[in-house]
Amino acid sequence: MDASHFDNWAENYDDDVRESNQAESYPFAGYERVLDRIASYVLAVPVGKILDLGTGSGTLASRFYDAGWEISAVDFSEEMLKQARERMPEARFLIADFAKALPKELDGQKFEFIVMTYAFHHLEYEKQADFLRSLLPFLKENGKILIGDISFETKMDLEKAKLQSGEEWDDEEFYPIIEGLREQLPDLHFEYEVISFCATVMRIGLKV
């Protein structure tokens, strides 16, 4: 999907997500619980800096902003960022497609957390592991990558969700398979929690 898709979706995005979440249907079954789980990790530690990749309308990032965190928010949709700016007027916003390259403005910066919610699955499968590794230099010591997404422990779990979702399933997305990522990134520590039949939250960092 390109930026124009999300520009056109921006006005109705939050309502569409809410409807899918409330119905416990694909693709956003468990959405609020995903956000709550990620927020619980972040808000349990002292205030610092967060990089939110694919921030969208800023629904999650605004929780951290309101709690005093310094937010750097990246998205490729200007219309989405307009909504995020309303929620976080003093945050730092960068318009860019992180799947192609991180903004140069981030060079040399480090964060307690790098967060991605419902964005990582836009990366092609062959790029996902390398992308995660490319984020490591941006983490402070003991920093974590937090991913909430349509994602699965195994390929079999994905196939079950696909069957359950029927015609609604989108075959053009690249929903992460945790088992495969762990095999490709043996030096990283993965913790994950299954939130719904089509959502997990991952917490990723260097093994110590």
Question: Where are the regions that the model predicts?
Answer:
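Short catalytic micro-motifs in class I SAM-dependent methyltransferases
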Residues: 118-119
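A conserved beta-strand element that flanks and buttresses the S-adenosyl-L-methionine
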Residues: 115
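Class I (Rossmann-like) S-adenosyl-L-methionine-dependent methyltransferase catalytic domain
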Residues: 1-42, 57-105, 146-208
